[in-house]
Amino acid sequence: MYTASDFKKGQPRWCPGCGDHFFLASLHKAMAEIGVAPENVAVISGIGCSSRLPHYMATYGMNTIHGRAAAIATGAKVANPNLTVWQVSGDGDGLAIGGNHFIHANRRNIDLNMILLNNRIYGLTKGQYSPTSPRGFVSKSSPYGTVEDPFRPAELCFGARGHFFARCVATDAQGTVEVLKAAYEHKGASVTEVLQNCVIFNDGCHEAVYNKEGRKKNAIYVKHGEKLVFGENNEFGLVQQGFGLKVVEIGKDGYTIDDVLVHDAHCEDNTLQLKLALMGNGDGFPVALGVIRDVDAPTYNDAVHAQLAEVSAQKKYHNFEELLETNDIWEVK
């Protein structure tokens, strides 16, 4: 039995009010509830404010190079499949210079718990727009507003044939712990997008859902097998309209609870899951929080080790040491 304190280490050096503080506390709690011994866990990050996180974990950890956290985490997991590996990146580190590693880790379905801390800004380098900053966003590197459309992390994950995608808000401790535990339970690559604030360079970037009252009005918590309802009294629901979704008020205009969709996170076809994941950008729909997609599939690391065992069994020499020790050998003293 572990407590959150068993996973704590050091004094976090983030700005007061930074979303990283909230997420770190939830990660400590989630790891305690998961129950894997600290010495069997590795937390691997790239470069950025959020990538300082391994310094504050009493586990194995690596604060590595810019954009390469997923690649290094892949090596760690394949080399030691018994290790529980968490990979932490920000939206800049993970989706700009690290974008290729992000999509290929998902495509290969490596058994990594990938955390994307999304504050829509480069914080460590003092306020440049990131791949998730909205079009028109004014920053130090876009003083007249960006002229680019942003990445939407769910689209990248799903487009790379990802099998697990969840979303939480850093200030929602219970919701964050729940999705982190689900990510751990998933066999294969899991992506958890964490909506968090940057109080210095992008304050209020997720304002609509950053506090409890806002989430009641502007978010929907999705759970497999449950109705897609939301609102302060669950008075609204999502129904299918053609190839899209529609928000309805239950009990009005002929809509009843029976018309409301039931969330299926395990459906291999990701069409409706992606529509849920993309809601909530000023389109009149709520932001979907929780486990949006969770589908089983073979993992890269299992396939690699199975292939090695199969091929090795067919060979005369089963490993490098056996090869070296064949024929005439001698020892130099």
Please place each PLM-identified region on the residue numbering.
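ATP/pyrophosphate-binding catalytic subdomain of soluble kinases
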Residues: F164-Y221
